[in-house]
Amino acid sequence: MKKKLFIKYFTPVLLSGLLLVSVIGCTDKLDEPFENESFTSDVDYTIAEDMVLPLMGAYYGFYTRQWEEPLTLGIRGDDVNAAGDQVPMQEQDNFTYMASHWNTNSVWQNHYNDIVNIFTAIDEINKYREASGNNALADQYIAECKVMRAYLYLNIARTFGGCIVIDALDNIQNTPLSNKEQVMQYIVSEMTDAIPNLPDVHPNKRIDIPGGMTTYTAYAIQALAYQEMEDYQGVVSATSQIINSGEFQLSEDYYHLFKVAGKLDDENIMEFQYSDFNQGEGDRFGFLFAPFGIGGWTPVVTGAGAGWGFYEPTMKYIEFMLDRGESVRLETSVIFTPDGITELQNDYGTLPEWIDNTNREGDIFNNNARLNFASGKHIQPSTELIPGRTSLGSNKNFIVIRYAEMLLMYAEAVTRGASAGSMSADDAVNMVRARAGLTNLSGVTTQDVLDEKFAELAMEWGTRYYDMIRTESVSELSHEGKTFTMDKAYLPFPADQVAELPQLEEGIQ
């Protein structure tokens, strides 16, 4: 059902040369995150039911990600190669950094655009508070905004080694730079404040905003911050809240978790939601998955869009999985071309019979000059396209945080000496392994968990890279001709941002 909403554009804020404008969307349906709306300059803060509109605007901005973001965050791990013709990404993959690289500037700028948008949304929600007569609901909406903002800060700090934690929009240029530890402490504190005000359910059980932020999204982000701080008891505390809630379970079908069937799955703690609105033409809200795809494929559905070939699983990862006897996770994570199969046979030897250049659905992946392998977690089978749609990944959500990651984070923390909660490290790891069809482990070590995370979470949002930085695993990141040193752990602040924000020039203290 379409609604016509009349709300204002938020006041533009100048940050690093970009005018920031918040655009508000609204939804009524599970599978329709946002619909087209009309805008005017009039706002009536006495209309209590409109208090949700600024929150919807925050979600709209949060879900509107740029294609280069997940690639930039992911390409430096030993699970991914930067393929294609994007020279800055190829240089970053080889740990050659330049402050002038366009994609790192984009990641910084777009994250801060959303942070400023969220600040504005919080301010707007508070303007409706009195008319709403519902302080608890206003507090919930603000808590949801804080969770989104915390995730954005988490990304920036892990990528650049620190960032500016904004305290007021009119004081950005005077706000001192925070190092990564300080940012993580801020995130932990923000989530502690937000958690009591959030819905205490799985995101897919929310009726008002299906898939929206909940208590457990906040706990997951808090756990990630604790992990970056190497506060492993904090990791156990936060992940235990998720584990003990009974709200989450591993999907029985790892392969289809990353397809349309995985939308709002019980395993997903946070995901960016997209939709074709169940129609073959007209409005759609989506992410541009083309950079993950392979050009020149032969899809089952004639005319289905191909891809650009910018994101390639590494030979190291594939051979690691073959050594473990992995099947479903390797099939899900890696798409093979004929040249890739030949390269593997020459380097590794005999391959399992199931390895082929055709997926389960019948799409054929032909040779491509840009890459020999592609990330299956990001390539939607053509048969899942709504008739009339042709864009790669159209109608596909983008999973950000999964229950499997929380289980493995919990297990690692216990192996590092944290007091266990309701389950052992063995139990947590073996839950994930059982889904993959692997045998149980006993006496799990930290290395066992890191290996399991490598197998389970490869190609997902730079998780492997962040683990290797946290553990200072220099030798792991030095692979396939690449040489890593810890002074390359973080990207430099973008030159365009340093020019606008003088505190960045001083660097991380």
Report the location of each language-model feature.
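Structural register within alpha-helical repeat arrays
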Residues: 142, 149, 215, 222, ...
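Long, intrinsically disordered, low-complexity segments
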Residues: 26-27, 48, 86, 111-114, ...
